Curated annotation (Swiss-Prot):
Its main location: secreted. Transmembrane segments: none annotated. One of its GO terms (cellular component) is extracellular region. Pfam families: CRF. This is Diuretic hormone 1. SMART domains: CRF. Regulation of fluid secretion. May stimulate primary urine secretion by Malpighian tubules and causes a dose-dependent stimulation of cAMP levels in the tubules. Belongs to the sauvagine/corticotropin-releasing factor/urotensin I family. It is found in: Secreted. GO terms for molecular function: hormone activity. Keywords: Amidation, Hormone, Secreted. The keyword Chloroplast does not apply.
């Protein structure tokens, strides 16, 4: 069980980092879209 755990842990950490970066990109895109929207008005 221990070896599989040592492999699983980094994978979950990587997955968390990836989802965090994806979230950040989405937020940035949304902010840019909001700015463009406000500029268009």
């Amino acid at each position: 069980r221990m070896p599989s755990l040592s492999i699983d842990l980094p994978m979950s950490v990587l997955r968390q980092k990836l989802s965090l970066e994806k979230e950040r990109k989405v937020q940035a895109l949304r902010a840019a879209a909001n700015r463009n929207f406000l500029n268009d008005i």
